[in-house]
Every structure is written in C-alpha cells, then in structure tokens.
C-alpha cells in the first residue's frame, strides 16, 4: 500500500514595480506551493490575489495545512476529501495537485496568450503576426480617461485589420463614462471587440451599455458573487473564469460546461500566478476550452519563474532551494 505524504512551501517573487492592484502597488507576488504524493506526485499553487481574493495568504496557509493533514491521515483508496467550504485559492491549488497526481490533468497545454495592448501598434502587430489561430489581444480600460481608452482601442483596431480585442474595465465606469468610451470606437470596429468585461458598476448598467452600443460584454467579477446564475443574454458573449478566485477545477469545469450549453465562450484567465500556476492554467485551458485563447499573458510581470518553465520565456527559474522559497512542512 502506497503511503501518502505532502509538503507545503511559500514563495515570494519580485514583480514589476508598476503593477497596481485595486489602487495599490504590488511589489512582490506571494503564494504557496503544494506537493501531494500517493504512488506519484502532484503539484499545485495556492496564491490569493491581494485586493481580489476573500482570503489572505496566512488564512489560505492555515486552511491548506488542515485539509492536507486530513487527507494524509486517510488511506490512498479512501473516499476523496471534499474541497467544499475551502477558500477558492486553496480549492484550486489542491485540486490541481490532486488531479496531476491522479493523472486527470492532461500534460498538453494551450500556451497561446492574448498579449496585453500598450505602446506602439507596430510592436503588437509583430507579436500577433507569429500567432497561430485567432489574433486576439487584451487591453485594460477604466484606469485613465474613458475618451482616451476609446481612442487607443480604436487605434489598435484601425492599425491591425484582423485584430480581435478583449477589453477589461473591472466595473470602473458609470454608464455615462462607458458611453464616452464607446463614442470613440468607430461603428465598423465594434464587432471586432470580442467582449468588454464588466464595463459598468452594476450588471444592469453593463447590460444597458451593451444595448446602446452593440458592444458585446462578458461577466468576470459577477461570476464570483453569491447566487450568481449564468443565463443567455442578448449581448453577453463570454464568461471569464479565474480559477484562483473561483475554486476547484471541478467548480470551474461546471461553469465551463454551463457556458458552453448556453452558446457562450468560456475563457480561462490568470490571477497573476507564478509560472507553476500559469502552466497548469494552460493545461486546464487546453483540456476544457481547447479552441479559445486563454488570458494568461501575465508572466512578464514577474522577475522569475517558479519550478516550471513557461515555453518561450527566458526568465530565470527558481527551485525549492532558492532564497525566494521557504519550506513550511
């Protein structure tokens, strides 16, 4: 009979000094690395996102140790220990480790990313020229003036005729501001906006924005609200799934299947995980949303990769002996 074991590590990686989350600078990305073993190993990342996750890293660590200890004290063929009631980041990281250990998480990943739009359109065009499949990029809006955001989005769409844009407003706009944005985007360009995530402060205002502008919208923050119910709506084209903020792989696949049954696109997206977590998100995307470009273009915000390399990245990789990683158990 195989013996169970687990380890837990804590990492702290320097990030881009310009990274702002919810109006505050994030100087380091911190999280937990979990290893589980029962005949074979599985790894996962537990990394609550400051300002977005309901749980702190310390709370996640305490809960992860409790869950892993319970799991470890049972035999390998014992019924699965449920993840119900655990924090989203804990449920996601542990489910990744368990599915990897059991061989449920396929090895192949979708490493095509939607690059972030900023700077010179020619530089973005060079990135997109080498991409296979749909040429899609992402642009954050709502931080600067709505008029400015609209002009820049329209500039990219004008400069790159086959570009599809995904926009993310994080509920920053009033309806008036959102309409100011749309006014700067030419009518013929609006259909190449795949979706605008949560343009307004409420779902009702976002729906009204979509009706008035004919710009498709997507739910992101709404998915994580209590009693959220995904329904088919006239201008809703996608649901954005951030597993670190939502929960286990099983919970995420339920949402994916629900979206697909309604004819909606499901997009796996990053919560600024390390390369370990990002590579597992790429595998989840390939396994469950194989024809959709995931939103995972966040690794360059970091100064290092953790344990596993992201294909094509030349960032240095740190291992368990690194000064950036501390063993807890």
Swiss-Prot record:
Entry EC no(s): 4.2.1.113
Single Gene Ontology MF annotation: hydro-lyase activity
Record's keyword annotation contains Translocase: no
Residues given in the record as Mg(2+) binding sites: 168, 197, 220
CDD domains: OSBS (cd03320)
UniProt-annotated catalytic positions: 140 (proton donor), 242 (proton acceptor)
Cofactor: a divalent metal cation
GO terms of biological process kind: menaquinone biosynthetic process
Pfam family, one: MR_MLE_C
Cited SMART domains: MR_MLE (SM00922)
Disulfide-bonded cysteines: none
Enzyme class of the recorded protein, top EC level: lyase
Keyword field: Lyase, Magnesium, Menaquinone biosynthesis, Metal-binding
Pathway membership: Quinol/quinone metabolism; 1,4-dihydroxy-2-naphthoate biosynthesis; 1,4-dihydroxy-2-naphthoate from chorismate: step 4/7; Quinol/quinone metabolism; menaquinone biosynthesis
Catalyzed chemical reaction(s): (1R,6R)-6-hydroxy-2-succinyl-cyclohexa-2,4-diene-1-carboxylate = 2-succinylbenzoate + H2O
Family stated for the protein in its record: Belongs to the mandelate racemase/muconate lactonizing enzyme family. MenC type 1 subfamily.
Function per UniProt: Converts 2-succinyl-6-hydroxy-2,4-cyclohexadiene-1-carboxylate (SHCHC) to 2-succinylbenzoate (OSB).
Protein name, as recorded: o-succinylbenzoate synthase
Organism (species): Haemophilus influenzae (strain ATCC 51907 / DSM 11121 / KW20 / Rd)
Annotated gene: menC
């Amino acid at each position: 009979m195989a013996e169970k074991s687990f380890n837990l590590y804590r990492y702290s990686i320097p990030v881009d000094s310009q990274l702002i989350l919810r109006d505050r600078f994030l100087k380091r990305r911190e999280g937990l690395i979990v290893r589980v073993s029962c005949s074979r190993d599985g790894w996962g990342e537990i990394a609550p996102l400051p300002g977005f996750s309901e749980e702190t890293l310390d709370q996640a660590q305490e809960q992860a140790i409790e869950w892993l200890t319970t799991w470890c004290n049972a035999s390998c063929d014992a019924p699965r220990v449920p993840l119900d009631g655990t924090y989203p980041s804990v449920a996601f990281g542990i489910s990744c480790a368990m599915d990897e250990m059991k061989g449920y998480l396929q090895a192949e990943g979708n490493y095509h990313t939607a690059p972030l739009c900023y700077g010179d359109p020619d530089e973005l065009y060079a990135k997109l020229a080498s991409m296979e499949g749909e040429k899609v990029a992402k642009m954050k809006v709502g931080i600067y003036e709505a008029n400015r955001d609209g002009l820049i989005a329209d500039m990219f769409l004008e400069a790159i005729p086959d570009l599809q844009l995904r926009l993310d407003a994080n509920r920053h706009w009033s309806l008036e501001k959102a309409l100011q944005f749309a006014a700067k985007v030419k009518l013929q360009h609006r259909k190449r906006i795949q979706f605008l995530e949560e343009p307004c402060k409420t779902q009702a205002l976002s729906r009204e924005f979509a009706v008035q502008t004919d710009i498709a919208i997507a739910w992101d923050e709404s998915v994580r609200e209590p009693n959220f119910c995904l329904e088919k709506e006239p201008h809703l084209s996608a649901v954005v799934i951030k597993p670190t903020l939502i929960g286990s792989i099983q919970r995420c696949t339920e949402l994916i299947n629900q979206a697909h049954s309604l004819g909606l696109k499901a997009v796996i997206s990053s919560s600024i995980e390390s390369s370990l977590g990002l590579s597992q998100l790429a595998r989840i995307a390939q396994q469950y949303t194989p024809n959709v470009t995931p939103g995972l273009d966040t690794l360059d915000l970091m100064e290092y990769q953790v344990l596993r390399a992201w294909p094509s990245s030349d960032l240095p990789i740190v291992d368990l002996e690194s000064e950036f990683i501390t063993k807890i158990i």
